[in-house]
Amino acid sequence: MSYASRKPQSRAEADAHARTLRALVKLPENKHCADCKRNDTRWASWNIGCFLCIRCSGIHRSMGTHISRVKSIDLDIWTPEQMNSIQKWGNKRANAYWEAHLKAGHAPPDHKVESFIRSKYELRRWARQTPIPEDPSVLDTDTPQAPTATTQPGAPPTSTRSA
């Protein structure tokens, strides 16, 4: 949908989105920045699906919108598409994908935060070796999935397990 063809958001819808966002940042997994682990997540990368502190949000913005699309939790109006993405993901699932091959709970030292973020998202240094799943609930398991022969680039990974 093009920008020009979007209908204006109603006040009720904007208020509902704001309430949902405030509730999401209160969840234990979203209270800390997905990247540096600091408190006060007032920003989010809606396409990655993670909540961020102000410092890390600036680094995300500097990577460009082809990597990360940042919005304020408090100041911006969120579209239904953006809300759907941030609600499906959250920090736990986002880090299950982007930090799959990194020690759990890793927090980079202050002087290395920018290089850590760029390695994490631009270079995909610790990411799963599978495409980003359409349904992030597949990441709710504790073990990273290896790519399968049926995984196509750009498509969600398929399971080889029997039902």
What residue ranges belong to the model's regions?
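Extended, low-complexity intrinsically disordered regions enriched in proline/Ser/Thr/acidic residues
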Residues: 2-31, 66-163
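Short beta-strand-initiation
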Residues: 19, 38-39
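Short cysteine-rich clusters marking metal-coordination/redox-active sites
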Residues: 33-36, 53
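Canonical RING-type zinc finger of E3 ubiquitin-protein ligases
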Residues: 39-48
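Alpha-helix N-cap/helix-start motif
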Residues: 45-46, 63, 110
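Short beta-strand-alpha-helix junction that forms the catalytic/metal-binding core
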Residues: 47-53, 84
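Cys/His-coordinated zinc-finger cores
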Residues: 51-66
